[in-house]
Regions:
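Short, compact, well-ordered microdomains
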Residues: 53-83
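Catalytic phosphate/metal-binding cores of nucleic-acid and nucleotide-processing enzymes, i.e., regions
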Residues: 1-47, 58-64, 75
Length: 83
């Protein structure tokens, strides 16, 4: 499938990956209700009316990367699939 369809499915809560990715255990999914802990130990909820509280998370063997950005190759690829 193409990137446009992949984004639609991502918004529906599906996990997606590309056939062309080296690690077969790698995928992206939509992260919601994002919060973080600051240096004082306070949990900060990043809910903002202007920017929302969602981001694309890349999940791989090294852990989770919040705020994954698609490359041009990712956006133009037709090898996206649901996990």
């Amino acid at each position: 499938m193409d990137f446009g369809k992949a984004i639609q499915l991502l918004k529906e809560g599906k996990k997606l990956q590309r056939e062309g990715w080296n690690g077969k255990k790698q995928y992206i999914e939509l992260a919601t209700n994002i919060s973080y802990q600051n240096t004082k130990g306070e949990v900060i909820n990043a809910e903002h009316d202007e920017i929302g509280n969602k981001a694309i998370a890349f999940v791989g063997t090294s852990g989770v990367q919040i705020g994954w950005l698609a490359s041009q190759a990712d956006m133009l690829a037709n090898d996206w699939k649901e996990v």
